[in-house]
Amino acid sequence: MAGLGASLHVWGWLMLGSCLLARAQLDSDGTITIEEQIVLVLKAKVQCELNITAQLQEGEGNCFPEWDGLICWPRGTVGKISAVPCPPYIYDFNHKGVAFRHCNPNGTWDFMHSLNKTWANYSDCLRFLQPDISIGKQEFFERLYVMYTVGYSISFGSLAVAILIIGYFRRLHCTRNYIHMHLFVSFMLRATSIFVKDRVVHAHIGVKELESLIMQDDPQNSIEATSVDKSQYIGCKIAVVMFIYFLATNYYWILVEGLYLHNLIFVAFFSDTKYLWGFILIGWGFPAAFVAAWAVARATLADARCWELSAGDIKWIYQAPILAAIGLNFILFLNTVRVLATKIWETNAVGHDTRKQYRKLAKSTLVLVLVFGVHYIVFVCLPHSFTGLGWEIRMHCELFFNSFQGFFVSIIYCYCNGEVQAEVKKMWSRWNLSVDWKRTPPCGSRRCGSVLTTVTHSTSSQSQVAASTRMVLISGKAAKIASRQPDSHITLPGYVWSNSEQDCLPHSFHEETKEDSGRQGDDILMEKPSRPMESNPDTEGCQGETEDVL
């Protein structure tokens, strides 16, 4: 098993290293800023001017080569259409298409007097204007939008209910559940920030805006023009910053959950209360530091639009810490699975059912995948492509797990938690008992005996005690013994003794002699210490730290 653990560690580090290396070579969103786009256009313009000078020296032609602001057009032939591939330096262009120009018989390019510029056909380059492509892409993104909107909404609702449940029961107040609640809040804030960002941020540069920026005679002026009126982007910049911050906090609270579970397994005498504030600092404080650094760098070096588009290497200020959290969580996951496999191997050595143990390992591993966010490392390792069926499948899977992860986490940490279920059952039993007691008539009425009958329908244990009580009341001596039996409510979990219950005992108990009543009083005094004392809620309700997950 030592060799198995070592191989798991080596395999994990190799996989993590290759994934992070592949991630470092690719842009997370595959987009560029306006400034980066303009720089590429300026470089193409300089190269085109050099080519034009060389072509003019070769001799006269029919239509002169020229730069139109987007494409460097070569020398044209009289009366024919010139076709040039769509330039690869324009991000939004269809790089597999071509642009067209027509050379007139008089040796000049077609000119549109209404627009005061040379005519050119870029319809094949503008891929999002093609009906067959735009309709399919629009439907695809609409499906994604509906899917992750439903997912984040379900996650938000389930997490809100889980927080109310854990916060309501004092017996569930402990460090482990406090960490769970912080994780729930981070998922809810992540969902909220996504909804807000979708409403206030424009995701793409429009065609008209692109043309207005790069179709100028001097594109360098457009860089300065983009910085003239920035007040209109303040709201969406704040939305983007908050989205990145809550996204980072969500990743780091998942890391905190992994660290906490790992310490419970591997650290002897682990004091969870002592490290709670440290976990809070990791989950909320550390992401605030590098997100603030990114915001300052973006405002200083690339203050364009809403900051929703990538700005070169500035993005690594917040992406590198997030990738580090994902990688560290993956290592903790491998180490935890290694311990589980070791325990199962040792259990099999003493003759347990092998298939049952491996099913238990598979179940625990599946739960740990969601708890540690292992699916993030899978999506990081996948190659980034923005076309084809593989990309569409990847987008569906990634957005599905990202949006529904909060729902899965709430099920694991709250709704399937044995302690939470026990507390809910206790509250339900108390509520049923209170309803039954309110429906019974006063004890002084003729139907006072029905009180005992009503209570017997609440729990099966009470029905047995009531039946035996009726039998022993017939004989005088047996009635004294029955009166000394502990009250059936004491057997209910979480039951709290109430003095009002003595007022609803059947009349037959009060018809005993003074001697018997004195003995009964002594017996009751002796029985009271046997009732379960209410223990500290901070410790009693939070036992078994690892059983809920493993």
Curated annotation (Swiss-Prot):
UniProtKB keywords: Cell membrane, G-protein coupled receptor, Glycoprotein, Membrane, Receptor, Signal, Transducer, Transmembrane, Transmembrane helix
Keyword Transmembrane: yes
Keyword Membrane attributed: yes
GO molecular function: G protein-coupled peptide receptor activity; parathyroid hormone receptor activity; peptide hormone binding
Segment forming the signal sequence: 1-24
Basic and acidic residues bias: start-end ranges: 511-531
Transmembrane segment boundaries: 146-169, 177-196, 238-260, 276-297, 317-337, 365-383, 395-417
Cell compartment(s), UniProt: Cell membrane
Tissues expressed in: Expressed abundantly in brain and pancreas. Also expressed in the testis.
GO term, biological process aspect, one: G protein-coupled receptor signaling pathway
Membrane topology note: Multi-pass membrane protein
Job of this protein: This is a specific receptor for parathyroid hormone. The activity of this receptor is mediated by G proteins which activate adenylyl cyclase. PTH2R may be responsible for PTH effects in a number of physiological systems. It may play a significant role in pancreatic function. PTH2R presence in neurons indicates that it may function as a neurotransmitter receptor.
Protein's name in the database: Parathyroid hormone 2 receptor
Protein's organism: Homo sapiens (Human)
Recorded name of the encoding gene: PTH2R
